[in-house]
Amino acid sequence: MFQGELRIDSQVPRGKGLKSSSAVGGAVLRAVASALRQSRSPEELARLAADVAQEIGLSATGAYDDCLAALRGGLVLTDNSKRTVLRSPPFTPGLGVVLWVPSKTHVPSVSFRERFQAEAGAGRAAVESARAGHWAEAMTLNTELVERIMGYDYRALRSELMAHGAAMCGVSGMGPALAALASEEHVDGVASRLPADRGEIRRIELRLRDGGSTENE
C-alpha cells in the first residue's frame, strides 16, 4: 500500500472565489500520480478531481472547468456534466491580470446553489456567448448573474475599470474576488482604481506554456 505525507503550500486564498479547492485537488492528484510514476494527462486528472469533488459534496457539478483550467491553463469552456471540453482557443499574449481580493470571505450555502439553479437560463446566455468566442460579453453576463444572486454590487466599480483600460472584468467564481484583464500598458491604471482599503490588490503576469496555454508568473 502506498503511504506518504502531503504538504500543501498555496498562494491562493480560500473562500474568495479564486478556485482554491479545484486548484488544490488537481495539484494533489498530479503529485500523487508523479509519486507513483504514472503519467496522466491534465484532462484525466481534472476528471478524477471533479468526480471526487462532486462525490464528497465539495461542488455540485464537480467544477471540471476549474480543475482543468488550473492544471492546463489558458481559456477553457467545458460541459461539466459530460466532463468534456467545448472550446479551448489559443490565449492572446500581452494581457495582464489584476485581482482585487476583498477581506470578506464567501461562505458556501445550499440556498445559493438553489438560486443558481433557478437562474439557469441566464447562465446559458453566458455559455452561448463564450461558445461564440465573445469572452468579454460572457464574463459580463456571468458576473451580473453572480452579483444578483450573491448580493455583490460591483457595477460602478466594473464600469470604472473598463473606463481605465480593462479589456474585460468580472467576479471570479462565486466571489467576492474581482478579476480584470488589461493590456500591459493599462494594468497599473486599472489597479489604481481598485479600493485598496477594502481588499488586497494583486497583479498577475501571464506567460505562455508549451502549447499556447497560460501560466501564472
Where in this protein do the model-derived segments appear?
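Alpha/beta catalytic cores of group-transfer enzymes, especially the acyltransferase/condensing modules
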Residues: 43-88, 158
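Phosphate-handling active-site elements
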Residues: 2-5, 32-49, 189-194
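Short beta-strand segments
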Residues: 70-71, 100-103, 172-173
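A short glycine/serine-rich beta->alpha loop
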Residues: 10-19, 54-61
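Glycine-rich, charge-dense phosphate/pyrophosphate-binding loop(s)
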Residues: 132-217
